[in-house]
């Protein structure tokens, strides 16, 4: 039976509501309470070298800043990850994983830059990170483009490849179409993730369909506290 991992991305996706200004005590409180909840993966914010360091915000210019914000936390989940919107954080601002508080990095990108973004994912993997390739606007991909992307995924073998329903356009059948393409063609070592949005009030239905589908791969499903995130 394949494994299911829950990824909490409140401190990252929730930041679209408050420009990532949660306040340091709230940041660490959310982090430690999500650890207590049993979530296997916690995403702690964006890495974006266009933004200055601010201990009260979960958008950080480099990996060292993650340690400065979270380093005193007593508890930690099995995996801590950050997110990079491809093109917004240079490799020189990413420490080797062994020197970093992070275990993994998720990279979001649109299909027209899939080749450049997947090469960036390969460089992050060389630094020792578990890399998640996040397919923004999954509904923009044709089946042929999905197969092109899967070719890159199978070459690089990231930790996971994830469907991102950026505009909340999927319904369960539509989502499962993309999922089945991934499940049938991605190497067994690569996990498959799903990040839903609730524009048409279908996020919960889509997540249930994703979780209940018979599958060959381990999967990762995203969630936030109170559904906090980008509308």
Predicted regions mapped to residue ranges:
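N-terminal capping/small domains of soluble enzymes
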Residues: 1-86
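Catalytic cores of alpha/beta
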Residues: 90-97, 141-153, 200-215
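Glycine-rich, proline-tolerant flexible connector loops at the mouths of alpha/beta enzymes
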Residues: 40-68, 106-114, 163-172, 226-230
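Conserved, mostly hydrophobic/aromatic
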Residues: 14, 34, 105, 161, ...
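Alpha-helix-loop-beta-strand connector modules within alpha/beta enzyme cores
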Residues: 52-82, 121-134, 176-194
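Catalytic alpha/beta core domains of metabolic enzymes, predominantly
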Residues: 160, 164-231
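Active-site mouth loops of central-metabolism enzymes
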Residues: 9-28, 79-90, 106-111, 132-145, ...
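Acidic (Asp/Glu)-rich catalytic clusters
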Residues: 35-36, 66-77, 92-102, 118-128, ...
């Amino acid at each position: 039976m394949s494994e299911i991992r829950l990824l909490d991305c409140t401190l990252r996706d929730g930041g679209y509501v408050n420009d990532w200004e949660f306040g340091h005590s709230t940041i660490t409180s959310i982090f430690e309470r999500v650890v207590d909840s049993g979530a296997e993966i916690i995403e702690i914010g964006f890495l974006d070298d266009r933004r200055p360091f601010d201990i009260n915000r979960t958008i950080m210019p480099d990996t060292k800043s993650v340690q400065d914000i979270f380093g005193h936390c007593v508890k930690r989940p099995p995996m801590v990850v950050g997110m990079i919107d491809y093109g917004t954080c240079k490799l020189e601002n990413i420490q080797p994983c062994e020197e970093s508080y992070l275990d993994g990095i998720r990279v979001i990108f649109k299909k027209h830059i899939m080749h450049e973004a997947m090469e960036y994912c390969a460089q992050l993997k060389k630094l020792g990170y578990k890399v998640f390739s996040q397919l923004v606007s999954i509904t923009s991909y044709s089946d042929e483009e999905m197969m092109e992307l899967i070719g890159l995924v199978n070459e690089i073998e990231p930790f996971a490849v994830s469907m991102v329903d950026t505009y909340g356009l999927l319904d369960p059948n539509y989502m499962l179409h993309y999922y089945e393409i991934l499940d049938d063609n991605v190497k067994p070592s690569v996990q498959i993730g799903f990040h839903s949005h609730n524009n048409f009030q279908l996020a919960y239905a889509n997540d249930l369909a994703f979780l209940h589908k018979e599958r060959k791969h381990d999967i990762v499903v995203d969630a936030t506290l109170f559904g906090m995130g980008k509308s």
